[in-house]
């Protein structure tokens, strides 16, 4: 893992938030229940908007993460919440409270920065995607059941989700592109060094192969 993160953990490791995924998922379930049975406008009061932040509604820098990402149906929302719990708890076990807290909060920070700099209304899409990508990179061979029937390795879910993100990024306006990049801040911070090391190792292997063919 990254050297900067090791140093940060040695100094501030006690500030990791335990059971952070359970807190996140419990909040999303509560918001979903309120939206279904009490007040359908609850998401408006929690969502991340630059204009409303600048009016002093500062709670939105945190409250937006409790709005579950919607795929257009209640079933997709419920499945999304379950998947967040499944992936998030696995990452917590792998990384520990502190590193997982840094990962999640740096994603939140990137999303807030993207909203403030571009004015694009934020959602939890990139935050949820960042959890999936982290899980896919750490556990690429784990199998999940697509539609509860078809076994498929997590790495393929990750590739598919990454491709969708790339197409969304390419189709966005210039402010939208900046927002997409900033909203994935946690992925860049945690996995760019790993990707760089993997790329260097691949280049060295290819150079060694070419050299030994001669």
Question: What do the predicted segments below correspond to?
Answer:
Residues 1-214:
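A detector for small-residue-rich transmembrane helices and their helix-helix packing motifs
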């Amino acid at each position: 893992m990254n050297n900067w993160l090791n140093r940060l953990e040695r100094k501030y490791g006690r500030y990791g938030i335990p059971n952070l995924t359970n807190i996140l998922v419990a909040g999303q379930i509560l918001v979903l229940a309120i939206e279904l049975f009490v007040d359908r406008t609850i998401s408006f009061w929690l969502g991340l908007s630059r204009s409303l932040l600048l009016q002093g509604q500062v709670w939105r820098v945190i409250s937006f993460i409790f709005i579950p990402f919607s795929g257009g149906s209640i079933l997709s929302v419920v499945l999304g919440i379950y998947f967040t719990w499944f992936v998030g708890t696995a990452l917590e076990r792998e990384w520990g409270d502190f590193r997982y807290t840094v990962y999640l909060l740096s994603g939140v920070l990137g999303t807030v920065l993207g909203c403030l700099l571009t004015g694009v209304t934020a959602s939890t899409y990139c935050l949820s995607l960042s959890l999936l990508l982290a899980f896919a990179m750490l556990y690429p061979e784990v199998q999940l059941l697509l539609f509860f029937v078809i076994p498929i390795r997590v790495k393929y879910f990750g590739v598919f989700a990454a491709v969708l993100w790339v197409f969304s990024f390419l189709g966005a306006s210039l402010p939208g592109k900046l927002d997409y990049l900033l909203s994935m801040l946690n992925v860049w911070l945690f996995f760019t060094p790993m990707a760089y090391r993997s790329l260097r190792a691949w280049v060295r292997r290819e150079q060694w192969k070419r050299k030994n063919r001669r």
